[in-house]
Amino acid sequence: MATYYSNDFRAGLKIMLDGEPYAVEASEFVKPGKGQAFARVKLRRLLTGTRVEKTFKSTDSAEGADVVDMNLTYLYNDGEFWHFMNNETFEQLSADAKAIGDSAKWLLDQAECIVTLWNGQPITVTPPNFVELEIVDTDPGLKGDTAGTGGKPATLSTGAVVKVPLFVQIGEVIKVDTRSGEYVSRVK
């Protein structure tokens, strides 16, 4: 694997620290008037998703992480594992609850997901940026009821709960941004 110096750190780069893979989310190179230059780096630990901020001297280096992002199709959940398939080789991979995390509430059958593999094992699953889900439960919106917050909670077919406008009803299909968990629009 390649070696990267701290001034080479860029958003999206995946490096190894303390034997674990991290993704660089932001990096700022600082050269003070007095003293040695350094880099302030925001990292995300790929195994747990926790965010860390570290400072590296300009002479510090890190090995590139041997992680692979693959586009896989979500097949099904057997209760313990979520199963994905590579559409080119038809090879199937299983991810556990730790790798899935909060993504489980956005996974639909046949959805294209990005699965990050480390040593051949899935460590994170990223659902599509937008999904279309049916509303299975929400309060009825009353005409002219605009004194409230302008929204109401709605339970979707996958169990996710999002805040939707008052005019949206049970049985309608809506588009949701999976990165923020927010309502985007109704689907015609």
From Swiss-Prot:
Post-translational modification: May be beta-lysylated on the epsilon-amino group of Lys-34 by the combined action of EpmA and EpmB, and then hydroxylated on the C5 position of the same residue by EpmC (if this protein is present). Lysylation is critical for the stimulatory effect of EF-P on peptide-bond formation. The lysylation moiety may extend toward the peptidyltransferase center and stabilize the terminal 3-CCA end of the tRNA. Hydroxylation of the C5 position on Lys-34 may allow additional potential stabilizing hydrogen-bond interactions with the P-tRNA.
PROSITE patterns: EFP (PS01275)
Keywords: Cytoplasm, Elongation factor, Hydroxylation, Protein biosynthesis
Biological processes per GO annotation: peptide biosynthetic process
GO molecular function list: translation elongation factor activity
Pathway annotation from the record: Protein biosynthesis; polypeptide chain elongation
Compartmental location: Cytoplasm
Its job: Involved in peptide bond synthesis. Alleviates ribosome stalling that occurs when 3 or more consecutive Pro residues or the sequence PPG is present in a protein, possibly by augmenting the peptidyl transferase activity of the ribosome. Modification of Lys-34 is required for alleviation.
UniProt name for this protein: Elongation factor P
Species name: Citrobacter koseri (strain ATCC BAA-895 / CDC 4225-83 / SGSC4696)
Organism classification: Bacteria, Pseudomonadati, Pseudomonadota, Gammaproteobacteria, Enterobacterales
Designated gene of the protein: efp
